């Protein structure tokens, strides 16, 4: 096909290649930093290569043209392929989890289809079931290997979502048969949005109210077979497809209604609650909160998903912004690159800094989750109340961190995807840019596994309660929230950070000089300012409004607290990781700038009013100025900083973001290869309707000349 070549001086390919060659650090070293170490980086590259080379897992531009049914069929084929990988990865299931996280970069619906089974179905059994029950379902029955048992997660109902305690499905114990009878008592109790239920799953972990001898013991979990070995529905089970959604059409979300479905009594998960054959209830109430520990894994994974998705789309937008030229200075024959406009820098580079901050926090949060889960298991087995207390404290801290980070990260990445789309102008609206499907697929992350507003307000409430305990000196907090102990050192009127970098809090573990970008702005002291703002806001929040104010009345402020806590977590972990690098590392200086840009841009864009209100800073002027300065400092290295993610074109899967930078040829070829205009001599299937419209007869002809002067004259009455 004939192509008109771009003017050489304005070739996107030449521009991107030139900036790539100007990278002043080793992108492999930066990749190792982002992947949390050399070994992890090697594993990531190996898994990405395996995924890309697998012809069945292949995803390309045609992915954006698939119908819902085509997505479902293709996803089923890919699930079958993944089943072989999980057998090979065993017993190192963490490798398969990483594989699944990487697949989700380009095919999130596939990641979800398998993730619901491994991450929700099995985690619910692990969290609520005994060790014997977990071993039976996971290994004897084969669920851990995607064999024989394929599970779904039956929590959400048509009339209840976040309020788990209000679920209305019932599980009534029958003393005569030693069985539970599961029922959907009315339409509102229909299990809804159940991923995999419509066509795939043959078992479901059902959250239902335990009824024994007429008494309601609250919501417990039960394994309910819903299809037989021939994949036919069991009697009493009604299932349907909930239909089209905004995105993730490859997931067969369904509804489930259960009518007098009987299961053996041992199908109830009984780690914390048991029903004896005498209808006696044995509960361990102090430990029941531990059951939700395993379910926090979904939120932790979504922070990793946020990092990966941010990597992909900030890369596309920044490559496009280097290759695309628009307008230009007077008396210049060459147009300016988009990235050279200060506004464009301010639109995109803070999101690049966010991506880097997400990298470290996602890995650290995953490690914390694994550690907490291990401690919970050990404490549960030992029945040592001292260890149990420590485990519960660790779980609370994990809940706060995961709730804050999941909600904040998924919100921010939704904003990132759309801002990157807008930054690519009209071409960003093309499906082949990748932005449209990605956004529609992504935004559900703000709702499932805990609605973001509810999660964030709950995390904010926990912060308020912890601050209250610290103020009363009831407890000393350890871990990431230990800064709350500084409440007694905070002068309510003193400025936490100003032009002289005065601070009321100290952090001796971090080299303050290293992270001072200039005389006005010091990243470490901005950390102190964030801590001070959280403490001051957290102390004041419970007292907002009248004495009769409820927690709901101050929910908006609790959400802000959660966001601040998430930003603090990301910034602290990024700074501590940078501190570990040697001064000779060439990429260190750019990481310092990125950390400073993340801190200052977050304050300027999202929290300025709170920092001023609570005197964390005395002026926004130095913050605003330094954001612009940092954008300029980072700007020249944007290609190297995004190449450091080491995403091949397979994982980018965008006509606008290929590694070569040949934007226009790639885009043109993609459009023409997938939309051949030569079908039926260039005519569309609906061409006849358009042609008939264009060739239609004049109105008077279509009206049979009934309103013509000649006819009207004949019909006129004679006077």
Swiss-Prot record:
It is found in: Peroxisome. Gene3D superfamilies: Acyl-CoA dehydrogenase/oxidase, N-terminal domain, Butyryl-CoA Dehydrogenase, subunit A, domain 2, Butyryl-CoA Dehydrogenase, subunit A, domain 3. A motif (Microbody targeting signal) lies at residues 716-719. Its cofactor is FAD. It catalyses: a 2,3-saturated acyl-CoA + O2 = a (2E)-enoyl-CoA + H2O2. Keywords: FAD, Fatty acid metabolism, Flavoprotein, Lipid metabolism, Oxidoreductase, Peroxisome. GO terms for molecular function: acyl-CoA oxidase activity; FAD binding; fatty acid binding. Its main location: other. GO terms for biological process: fatty acid beta-oxidation using acyl-CoA oxidase; lipid homeostasis. It comes from the Eukaryota. It is an enzyme of class 1 (oxidoreductase). Its EC number is 1.3.3.6. One of its GO terms (cellular component) is peroxisome. Pathway: Lipid metabolism; peroxisomal fatty acid beta-oxidation. Belongs to the acyl-CoA oxidase family. PANTHER family: ACYL-COENZYME A OXIDASE-LIKE PROTEIN, ELECTRON TRANSPORT OXIDOREDUCTASE. This is Acyl-coenzyme A oxidase. It comes from Komagataella pastoris.
